[in-house]
Amino acid sequence: MSDNKQYRLVTRSDFDGLVCAILLKHINLVNDILFVHPKDMQDGIIAVGANDISTNLPFVDGVHIAFDHHHSETLRNEKKDNHIIDPEAPSAARVVYDYYGGTETFPASWESMMKAVDKGDSAQFDMEEVLHPKRWELLNFIMDSRTGLGRFRDFRISNYELMMDLIEFGKDHSINELLELPDVKERTELYFAHEEKFKAQIKRCATVHGNLVVLDLRDEEIIYSGNRFVIYALFPQCNISIHIMWGLKKQNTVFATGKSIFDRSSTTNVGELMLKYNGGGHNAAGTCQVPHEQNEACLAELISAINADS
């Protein structure tokens, strides 16, 4: 921090990425931001170098410094001095916050924001917050690309522009003020408009395999938007789920696997399981992408492995 050099932040376009950006801009470390998909980092599609700081993404050699909290990254990489990783941290933002001095460096008024990002990234929600989100929980869900709002409307501004606005606005405004921003309200209104259709779709497309619920959305013409934890509220008897979706331009099949946030008894290490199929994640959630011709065999293997762990 002493050389006054500024870097580009490479991160995810989600709530954790937003808070990482707010923290790093506060200490004048970043002057540019690039939002990327984690698999693009892992596959080397994103060109990064000594002028980049990455957060919440697979480690790529050559970056100035990388912050993360994904368990699978400790398995995939040898320990490096510029890879600041804490699998016990609830969010990548918390790793950044602690590394740069915590309360000695950052405003005390940000404590509610830090608690919210920790809660959001580690999914410490209760059933009421999942089924009827408000305040920080609602902001977290509308910023999560997996909620799927972007499929339905050309919003006044893009998600990138909204992220950039929230980075500036979020540092000195309350959550109630953030939710009153017209571009945020536009998204929350759509979220609530889809709420009941989303629940009905989950019930129609889900199949239960022991402790696992599999949601196959590939044949659905419209996939309604909604937060990714609703499935656990609708299937409380299951402690883990797999969402099956088309990959980009239907080039492959995506298996997005996550543990229930209400029944946390599953012993499967999802990140390690996904790593076997060139994916990744952490103990409680992860994804992999497989060629179409392998998807049936892969799904059968995943179901078998997850049921064996129960």
Regions found by a protein language model. Give the residues of each.
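Active-site rim beta-loop-alpha module in soluble metabolic enzymes
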Residues: 168-217
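Long, charge-rich alpha-helical interaction segments
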Residues: 145-185
